[in-house]
Curated annotation (Swiss-Prot):
The lineage of its organism: Bacteria, Bacillati, Cyanobacteriota, Cyanophyceae, Synechococcales. The keyword Hydrolase does not apply. Catalyzes the phosphorylation of the position 2 hydroxy group of 4-diphosphocytidyl-2C-methyl-D-erythritol. The gene is ispE. This is 4-diphosphocytidyl-2-C-methyl-D-erythritol kinase. The active site is at residues 21, 148. It holds the Pfam family GHMP_kinases_C. GO terms for molecular function: 4-(cytidine 5'-diphospho)-2-C-methyl-D-erythritol kinase activity; ATP binding. ATP binds at residues 106-116.
Length: 319
């Protein structure tokens, strides 16, 4: 790595968007020796994004402000953790940043909003501080901070294995698909709870050998609907955590039922550990038309909804 003299001009502004993700496939294979679950997933970036702005500080402080007062801006926030990690790895202890977060991805929704914000911080401060870390190095830092963060940084369409940090890129789509995404704003689901409950219910089905894990990975790699993703052979959508969460979270049941009534939907599923759910469509126009038709029902149920195209790339500097 070659590091230039770090930037210290306090007026310089860098902006980065941090897109949400959905899980087109989430399979819990078994338990790893480190206690985490071994996963086989297909993750997809979508055009619902937080916005982050970064400025240098002359006194070396790192601070975070957010337009959503319910979100912690202290050291437990992945943005703050990512900033401190990057500064530590740079070797320049005098570096500081004032960070502003415009929160658009719902919190605790199974959309990796916090992980994406942390990944965006690595990209934004790498640019602001003129550090010149490579994409591979940034993905390594991201993996230290969270299982979803390497994907959030790389973005697009990816196979994700291990805890989710091992990425294999998929071919780019020729035409973007889209989703209608829906969440009950009053409900959140704890990811550790969801995986813990999965272990309680289904541990007897878990695979235990690496050879068995690899067999399932290869079966997913060879799925007919991959490479590239396409509307004429759409992903069947699968999420092992849906069988865990839906029976115990009524909002997920309601959301899936309303989504299943959307005209033109190709498939319906929960994302991640929930409670966000989505319906898949061949294109944005079809998704927008379906959302417009079903919007009164979503509103009556107190549900928030979005129409989001698939996003083909990861996190990039905007300025």
């Amino acid at each position: 790595m070659s590091i230039s003299s770090p930037s210290a001009a306090s007026g310089h502004l860098v902006s980065v968007s941090a897109p949400a993700k959905i899980n087109l496939h989430l399979e819990v294979l078994g338990l790893r020796s480190d206690g985490f679950h071994e996963l086989a997933m297909v993750m997809q970036s979508i055009e619902l994004a937080d916005q982050l702005h970064f400025r240098n500080t002359a006194d070396g402080t790192i601070s975070l402000r957010c337009d959503d007062s319910s979100l912690s801006t202290a050291g437990d926030n992945l943005i703050v953790q990512a900033a401190h990690l990057l500064r530590e790895r740079s070797g320049f202890s005098e570096l500081g940043a004032a960070i502003e977060l415009q929160k658009r991805i719902p919190i605790g929704a199974g959309l990796a909003g916090g992980s994406s914000d942390g990944a965006a911080t690595l990209v934004g401060l790498n640019g602001l501080w003129n550090l010149n870390f490579s994409q591979g190095q940034l993905e390594g830092f991201a993996a230290e901070l969270g299982s979803d963060m390497p994907f959030c940084l790389a973005g697009g369409s990816q196979l994700c294995f291990g805890r989710g940090e091992r990425l294999e890129s998929l071919q780019a789509m020729q035409a973007s698909m889209a989703v209608v995404l829906v969440k009950d704003p009053s409900v959140s689901v704890s990811t550790p709870w969801a995986y813990g409950r999965c272990k309680e219910l289904f541990r007897s089905r878990y695979l235990s050998q690496e050879s068995d894990f690899e067999q399932r990975r290869q079966q997913l790699r060879e799925s007919s609907w991959l490479n590239p993703l396409r509307a004429d052979d759409p992903p069947p959508l699968h999420n092992d955590l849906q069988a865990v969460v839906a029976p115990e979270v009524f909002a997920v049941q309601t959301t899936l039922k309303l989504l299943s009534d959307l005209p033109g939907s190709l498939a319906v599923a929960m994302s991640g550990s929930g409670p966000s759910c989505f319906a898949l469509f061949a294109d944005v126009d079809s998704a927008q038309a379906a959302l417009k038709r079903q919007q009164p029902a979503f509103d009556a149920a107190g549900l928030s909804s979005w129409c989001c195209a698939f996003r083909s790339e990861g996190i990039k500097l905007e300025a």
